[in-house]
Regions:
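Short linear motifs at protein or domain termini
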Residues: 1-113, 223-248
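Conserved acidic
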Residues: 19, 23, 92-95, 99, ...
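Poly-acidic low-complexity segments
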Residues: 47, 137, 184-187, 191, ...
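Mobile beta-alpha loop/short-helix "lid" or hinge segments that flank ligand
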Residues: 71, 75-76, 168, 184-186
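Conserved amphipathic alpha-helical segments that form helical-bundle/coiled-coil interaction surfaces
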Residues: 113, 117-178, 187-197, 201, ...
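Membrane-interface catalytic loops of GT-C/OST-like multi-pass glycosylation enzymes that act
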Residues: 181
Length: 248
């Protein structure tokens, strides 16, 4: 059975399922997961009364969570209309991938200057992990891929870049899972090994060009999939139900 995304996915599942939520942070985590996995229908106004009832909480922590998620870009806030989940459409996906490319290319250039051999050895081990993950399910591939790219950005030794990537990973996780779950394994894992070699050679130019091509290929594939349409992307799918622990 295919597992659905939510990494760091496995620990989150138990925390999201089960008894009514009691803290503002848990309400925030639950609603964020519902938004990311499209358990809330995109572009439709969120019914706060119904959602509070469903979660077993009052309107106060729920409104706090909605405000926070809107500020972080997970929800859209509209005057006199409330909150809604951003739709999964090609334009939004393009925006996210453009941001990711700009961020990771910049980080790679800094890493070529700043990374030490120990850090590159760790990155090499993570590149091998992504190669081994291709025989596993999409969730394992996604976890390995995220670990590689996160460590690469960490090698830039720039805390703001790393913080931005982690936030971006959360917003893109379901999109990237669709790519891995529906697509065929490609040569993207070999490109990770090449990136490590280019970083060891301190060849920032070639590394940046490879990163741009690497991300653009993934963008092209996921955009094509979204245009084709997948019913399970949106509310009511069993994949979201499994990760959130509620009925489809």
């Amino acid at each position: 059975m295919t597992r659905s995304p939510g990494a760091d996915p496995e620990p989150a599942t138990g925390a999201l399922a089960g008894a009514p939520l009691r803290s503002a942070d848990r309400v925030y985590a639950r609603v964020k997961a519902m938004a990311v996995f499209y358990r809330l229908r995109p572009s439709e106004r969120i019914n706060e009364v119904e959602l509070a009832r469903r979660l077993g909480v009052s309107r106060t922590p729920l409104r706090e969570a909605l405000n926070r998620l809107a500020a972080e870009g997970f929800l859209e806030a509209t005057v006199n209309r409330g909150y809604s989940v951003l739709p999964l459409d090609p334009k939004r996906v393009l925006t996210l991938y453009e941001y990711r490319a700009t961020l990771e290319i910049g980080a790679l250039r800094l890493a070529a200057e700043r990374a030490d051999e120990g850090g590159l050895d760790q990155l090499d081990a993570l590149a091998r992990r992504t190669q081994h993950s291709t025989g596993q399910d999409a969730l394992a591939q996604l976890a390995a891929d995220e670990a590689f790219h996160t460590h690469l950005v960490a090698l830039a030794d720039n805390a703001e870049m790393l913080r931005s990537l982690r936030s971006l990973n959360e917003r893109m996780r379901f999109i990237r899972w669709i790519d891995l779950d529906k697509g065929q394994p490609g040569h993207w894992t070999d490109e990770h090994a090449t990136m490590v070699a280019l970083l060891r050679a301190r060849d920032a130019g070639a590394g940046a060009a490879l990163m741009q091509a690497h991300i653009t290929r993934r963008l092209d594939r996921i955009t094509e999939m979204i245009r084709a349409g997948f019913a399970e992307i949106y509310t009511g799918n069993a994949l979201a139900a499994r990760i959130l622990g509620d009925a489809a």
